[in-house]
């Protein structure tokens, strides 16, 4: 696993061995960023100086990729101490630990964001364990608790056969399938 582009392009990321984590594949992450940067007609945001939230962070690859590409800050949420430890190790390895906030939280039961999270965020990524029914409650909590900025882009990774429902404040911009993975791009507009 590596950073795909930006100032840390090609740098390897640590991943726990023997873990049940399912990190987003490099090629899928690269495709996601190609869509974000070149394929969304109705999103007017930017990665430059963005505040990002990576929910169900795992290794932190998505948030770290955004920092490599110009984001100002990334908040990583996971309920696993091992996931947060590997994310911290990766951020330290890249020399960007000052640009991150690590929060050990259950994403389905979020409270309002702490000041360190630099919320509301203009870009969010949710990659819950597949088929566990965690994505929709986490998405609803991000909205309800004020984690998302108006016009935020929310990228949701789910199993290809899963369906995603969301409130009327979200609109689907794009949907892509990569083998067993479906990626849904949503715009949040209050």
Give the predicted meaning of each segment.
Residues 1-190:
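Class I S-adenosyl-L-methionine-dependent methyltransferase catalytic core
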